[in-house]
């Protein structure tokens, strides 16, 4: 299975009310995929959000990366993704954090550890077929 690697620039950053909509398909043999909200285009840039569905371990991990170091992982309850099935994720910037909505259900509200205004790039990668990435 070939890994997806897609990047979309956000030159204006992220502010309260910004919505990122990711639509795709989880392949039958998928292990993991991720959506990263990065603070720069350089290798090793800080990540304001690392959203990481792990089908191989049936969990979704949320985290940040600052100065090359990962923070404390947070996990949602259950895994709202299934191999061979399409999905829609909304990442919504709020005053408090990033709200992750999968399908019609709020999944987790990840509290800001880095200012969302620093975000410059959305990166989608791993075992996923990306259909669309829209920023509203």
From Swiss-Prot:
Keywords: Apoptosis, Cytoplasm, Lectin, Nucleus, Secreted. A beta-D-galactoside binds at residues 70-76. Residues 6-136 form the Galectin domain. It is found in: Cytoplasm; Nucleus; Secreted. Signal peptide: none annotated. The keyword Secreted applies. It holds the Pfam family Gal-bind_lectin. It comes from the Eukaryota. One of its GO terms (molecular function) is carbohydrate binding. Transmembrane segments: none annotated. InterPro entries: ConA-like_dom_sf, Galectin-like, Galectin_CRD. One of its GO terms (biological process) is apoptotic process. Disulfide bonds: none annotated. GO terms for cellular component: cornified envelope; cytoplasm; extracellular region; nucleus. Monomer. PANTHER family: GALECTIN, GALECTIN-7. Could be involved in cell-cell and/or cell-matrix interactions necessary for normal growth control. Pro-apoptotic protein that functions intracellularly upstream of JNK activation and cytochrome c release. This is Galectin-7. The lineage of its organism: Eukaryota, Metazoa, Chordata, Craniata, Vertebrata. The gene is Lgals7.
